Amino acid sequence: MAYNINMSPKRNPMPTQDAHERAHNFNEVALGYSEEAAINEAFRCLNCKNMPCVSGCPVKIHIPEFIAAVRGGDFEGAYKIITDTSSLPAVCGRVCPQETQCESKCVRGLKGESVGIGRLERFVADWHNTFGDGNVSAPKPNGHRVAIIGSGPSGLTCAGDLAKKGYAVTVYEALHTAGGVLVYGIPEFRLPKAIVAKEVETLRRLGVDIETNVVIGKTLTVDELFAMGYEAVFIGSGAGLPNFMGIPGEALCGVYSANEFLTRSNLMRAYLDDSDTPIMKGGRVAVVGGGNVAMDAARTALRLGADKVYIVYRRSMNELPARREEVEHAEEEGIEFRLLCNPVEILGFSNPENPRDPKNGFVRGIRCIKMELGEPDAKGRRRPVEIAGSEFDMEVDTVIMAIGTSPNPLIKSTTAGLEVNARGGIVVNEDGLTSRDAVYAGGDAVTGAATVISAMGAGKTAAKAIDEYLAGK
């Protein structure tokens, strides 16, 4: 059907909290589109016949189709189109890097800004959660049982896809709350816990059983899951083992991995005065790294009362791997970027005259060396090179290392015949099948730390393979 295309080169702006106000609270920064803004943005879509945007989506959402429904005001219909392929639309609409995926393929981006696909997805999911039909029922059981290890994006996606086909699915989560990295790793101001809980509840209504406080490799093993009657197992245990630089001073009090810092804040409320697992608040904080996790840690530290927060990154602003939107939000909130420098030592306080001085063993600063960009590395980014003799010190009280994570070796060490690569990632084929029969894996447990949507894509791929495998038994 013909319609009048909105040819504005600019997308509809996303309303946000004022930067000065939001720097002191954990409320969501982006406020979401109104119905009017969503429909107006939907009219920017050209409804391309070859649908290049879909090719950029790891879970292959029918993007032009759901946008057409938004354009016509059928928001519930749009939700049904999205959830035909995605189990976590309200999550993806908020945290997926659409600018490097579906939106990067949008034809409107050739002469202006791409259609705000992620913003429209979020609008549709939020509208459904507020006004839509929440009646979801489990399909007829098909008699097969599947165990999912981990309730992060790959595990939840795999569970949802299998549950829709009638499988009896049990998800085993090591922590006390379902959601994986979505709840322990991403702060409330970017992804509210209530949003994740709503998505998880939808899966429960589909018949998915979620058991928390079960550590596979400790509480149960993969082999014991098969002994319990499960016919296939999907490992979506993520990459929760933090990386460090191996420089002097990393054992000082006041040095955290971003993984620990965010988990304590997001999930354990360690910022409370009576917390059993407190984290340091206030003072000057240096966050080492340039990805989304670094931005999350820096902005969390600011909200916890830090006097000053620095991002320390060895490349320039152009090479920052974090989403541009997150970088802009951090800058607006007053976080200072110390670029083209890299830590070589974390400096600690030591009072030789008073070994009982309570400051002994705590961070007092960080020593960095200036960098310059050399030749491109294997990923095409210019390699940072140290400038000899350029060391300088920064006075800080807390250092947060946000330089990536690796898969935990626990499952590998308790599962005979499970092959992993040099970085600890589980080795899989194109269907997510591991070196063990009927054991599949996906997400960060395979790739190391990556995006939510790529993990979801891996969960979807594995679910399809598991269905084909069990259908043939």
Residue ranges and their predicted role:
Residues 251-282, 376-449:
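FAD-site-proximal beta/loop scaffold in flavoenzymes
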Residues 47-72, 91-124, 170, 177, ...:
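Iron-sulfur cluster-binding cysteine motifs and their immediate structural context
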